[in-house]
Curated annotation (Swiss-Prot):
PANTHER family: 40S RIBOSOMAL PROTEIN S15A. It comes from Chloranthus spicatus (Chulantree). The keyword Mitochondrion does not apply. This is Small ribosomal subunit protein uS8c. It is found in: Plastid, Chloroplast. One of the primary rRNA binding proteins, it binds directly to 16S rRNA central domain where it helps coordinate assembly of the platform of the 30S subunit. GO terms for cellular component: chloroplast; ribonucleoprotein complex; ribosome. InterPro entries: Ribosomal_uS8, Ribosomal_uS8_CS, Ribosomal_uS8_sf. Pfam families: Ribosomal_S8 (PF00410). Part of the 30S ribosomal subunit. GO terms for biological process: translation.
Amino acid sequence: MGKDTIADIITSIRNADMEKKGTVRIASTNINISENIVQILLREGFIENVRKHRENNKYFLVSTLRHRRNRKGAYRNILKRISRPGLRIYSNYQRIPRILGGMGIVILSTSRGIMTDREARLEGIGGEILCYIW
């Protein structure tokens, strides 16, 4: 685990998805950011449920990946980190990209917290583009 909490979350989910694991354990160094991103994924239907787990004074978020009904394995979600510590990417609300014509989501960090592209457009605020999920 490095210093980039968001990249660690995305990498943990992507690795669990590639290994066809049902659950993923996300280390929460910054519990607020981790919880907000996982709650967005839960609300948008990319994961099924999430629970907090504490072990030796360390907090973990245990997330269950969403599975297909008639086939084994999880849905293939593509998660891509956009803004990173070495290169920050910002956008106003009018220029927030639409992923797959609105089928995917963009997670942004705004002055009002972490939210999706749809919420940011409705509120008329822009921010730092954290990642794309489709």
